[in-house]
Amino acid sequence: MKPSIVAKLEALQERHEEVQALLGEPSVIADMDRFRALSREYAQLTDITRCFQQWQQAQEDQQTAEMMLDDPEMRDMAQEELKEGKATIEALEQQLQVLLLPKDPDDERGCFLEVRAGTGGDEAAIFAGDLFRMYSRYAESRRWRVEVMSASDGEHGGYKEVIAKISGDGVYGQLKFESGGHRVQRVPATESQGRIHTSACTVAVMAEVPEAELPDINPADLRIDTFRSSGAGGQHVNTTDSAIRITHLPTGIVVECQDERSQHKNKAKALSVLGARIRAAEVQKRQQEEASTRRNLLGSGDRSDRIRTYNFPQGRVTDHRINLTLYRLDEVMEGKLDTLIQPVVQEYQADQLAALSEQE
């Protein structure tokens, strides 16, 4: 490992001890925002420090094994230990490089998840419902909280569009690669001839950010319309115009919210989603400029970018970005998404490492 990387790891080890001491100080404990920020930093540094300590121990073990080579009785065992130790050190160095990659500050935040029916009519809306259920089950398995912000029901089930806020640790970091086009191939329940239909939905994942970090929105740039809500899931039909539609005139972004009975609450929710959308568009533009010379697994921001196909007759799901095919569709639709998400995360990290190597 390069001396510069070892020096950086030693500095982080010192910072880990420093943060540990700070977390025990009464002034820090009394300041909840600072305490949370330091706790997050401590958790990240703990992973790096633990891995670095394992690497240091492996290096010491290698030196001990090399000294044993001079002893004829111990030589065979020493050679075996050196071989195993070399593999261990290489694996730890790879892990440390990943841990040292620049962190996306949004990764630890919650997110807004949008699922929208695309081509395919009723079947697309039904599939949008299936996708939302899939993400909800995944969130449940991670002990995240899902709150529906707005939902427009499909005529025969599912959703024309559903927006939810998902809260918890590391939500955005896990779900941000889900943005893009999701295609389904299956025989609809209404199909009497048994023909396979192809439908599509689009998914957008945007980081939830504190109000202080949201972009400044000029009230003059907003057109706010009220309309009568059909209520969440078609229930509790309102007799007042409590639903809100906000249009951001400079960008054309439109957000609707009708989940609450209170117009004030719907407006607050819609504004938070609008702010997240505007910020996401700005971040996406910057990422595209930075990654213009290499592929961007986060997608182009174009909802029509197809990232995944779900083929029900074959029980197959394919991620087109990394050419990954799994025959575990039933498990995936039940929310077991790590087998799809983790390979994309790893590929993204490999791309980051390659980009850093090019810079060096």
Curated annotation (Swiss-Prot):
<dbReference type="Pfam" id="PF03462">
    <property type="entry name" value="PCRF"/>
</dbReference>
<dbReference type="InterPro" id="IPR000352">
    <property type="entry name" value="Pep_chain_release_fac_I"/>
</dbReference>
<dbReference type="GO" id="GO:0016149">
    <property type="term" value="F:translation release factor activity, codon specific"/>
</dbReference>
<dbReference type="InterPro" id="IPR005139">
    <property type="entry name" value="PCRF"/>
</dbReference>
<comment type="function">
    <text>Peptide chain release factor 1 directs the termination of translation in response to the peptide chain termination codons UAG and UAA.</text>
</comment>
<keyword id="KW-0648">Protein biosynthesis</keyword>
<dbReference type="InterPro" id="IPR004373">
    <property type="entry name" value="RF-1"/>
</dbReference>
<feature type="region of interest" description="Disordered">
    <location>
        <begin position="284"/>
        <end position="305"/>
    </location>
</feature>
<dbReference type="Pfam" id="PF00472">
    <property type="entry name" value="RF-1"/>
</dbReference>
<feature type="compositionally biased region" description="Basic and acidic residues">
    <location>
        <begin position="284"/>
        <end position="293"/>
    </location>
</feature>
<dbReference type="InterPro" id="IPR050057">
    <property type="entry name" value="Prokaryotic/Mito_RF"/>
</dbReference>
<feature type="modified residue" description="N5-methylglutamine">
    <location>
        <position position="235"/>
    </location>
</feature>
<dbReference type="InterPro" id="IPR045853">
    <property type="entry name" value="Pep_chain_release_fac_I_sf"/>
</dbReference>
<keyword id="KW-0488">Methylation</keyword>
<dbReference type="GO" id="GO:0005737">
    <property type="term" value="C:cytoplasm"/>
</dbReference>
<comment type="similarity">
    <text>Belongs to the prokaryotic/mitochondrial release factor family.</text>
</comment>
<keyword id="KW-0963">Cytoplasm</keyword>
<protein>
    <recommendedName>
        <fullName>Peptide chain release factor 1</fullName>
    </recommendedName>
</protein>
